[in-house]
């Protein structure tokens, strides 16, 4: 959640992109609810990695976690140094099974987690991948 949402202006001038409401719920709330629904284990903590969005955003994110019976942890990424750095900033929360998701991406989590695998990456095939990271599969 550390990005600025420049492509959704003017909406993101006052609201961070993941907190923009989409049919009554914020994008991040929908994402978190979908992920919690596919997890077979109890979710104890939901960590949100954010830039400098302010205390109201912290409260909103903690409420999303609380409403799902989890502790909401807010971690700050002070410099926009990429996804790996953002995850590193949240290293204290990386215990046990972990799901990493982009808070501004809408998708329906209609899959199941397979605990037999050490790691899983969910990807989507798109026509023009030039603006994205690319995953090659066999």
For the regions a language model picked out, list residue spans one by one.
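Conserved core of the sugar-phosphate nucleotidyltransferase
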Residues: 107-138
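Conserved beta-strand scaffold positions in the cores of enzyme catalytic domains, especially
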Residues: 19, 74, 119-121
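Active-site glycine-centered loops adjacent to acidic/histidine catalytic or metal-binding residues
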Residues: 3, 104, 125
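N-terminal nucleotide-binding beta1-loop-alpha1 segment
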Residues: 1-13
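Conserved N-terminal catalytic core of the sugar/cofactor nucleotidyltransferase
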Residues: 7, 21, 25-106, 111
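Short intrinsically disordered, low-complexity coil segments enriched in acidic
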Residues: 1-3, 46, 135-138
